[in-house]
Regions:
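Alpha-helical transmembrane segments and their helix-helix packing motifs
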Residues: 2-177
Length: 177
């Protein structure tokens, strides 16, 4: 269900306080565009922008410009209705591509000193946090899964967990080896 996205990000209480219905429209709005949700994409982009603004003296100058452009793009796209089903995939693909561009830019231009170390620690902590959330979600689905539903359900669930964490390619390469 769509609500699993809210649960995955520990936003159940915040969601329930603002929305009565657990449907696609509300979940997408809450997770991407709700400026009162501290974990929404829009709030996260604004926080990254603010963090870069306050650390401009130690971060590459263009990183600030790139995140500023991405934040402006996201806000304008949301105003223009990009959360609708027909436009959402293209919008999220653009956001993902811009995030990867920013990550790559910082990784290739930041001096490898204590600032680099802190940036790497933050990236690794965020990755570990998201990985444990995805694993928790997969484990929960398996624990509540009725064995009579489908014999291959565990394989499908773990395949989805691997894809969600971007680990499916590495898994296939190692299993095939």
């Amino acid at each position: 269900s769509w609500f699993n996205l809210v649960t995955l990000n520990s936003g159940d209480a915040e969601y329930e306080a603002r929305y009565k219905v657990r449907d696609e429209r509300n979940v997408v709005k809450f997770t991407l565009a709700d400026d009162t949700n501290s974990g929404s994409m829009l709030v996260s982009l604004s926080m990254v922008r603010e963090n870069l603004r306050t650390t401009r003296d130690v971060m590459p100058e263009s990183a600030w410009e790139l995140i500023n452009e991405l934040t402006t793009f996201a806000k304008q796209s949301i105003k223009d209705g990009c959360l609708n089903r027909g436009k959402r995939h293209e919008f999220l693909t653009q956001v993902t591509n811009q995030c990867q561009l920013i990550q790559g830019y910082i990784a290739s231009t930041l001096s490898h000193d204590e600032v680099w170390d802190m940036w790497c620690i933050g990236r690794h902590l965020e990755c570990a946090d998201m990985t444990t959330r995805i694993l928790d979600a997969g484990t929960h689905v398996l624990a509540t899964h009725d064995d009579r539903d489908e014999a291959h359900a565990p394989l499908i669930i773990w395949g989805n967990v691997l894809r969600s964490s971007g680990a499916d390619h590495a898994y296939r390469r190692n299993v095939a080896a």
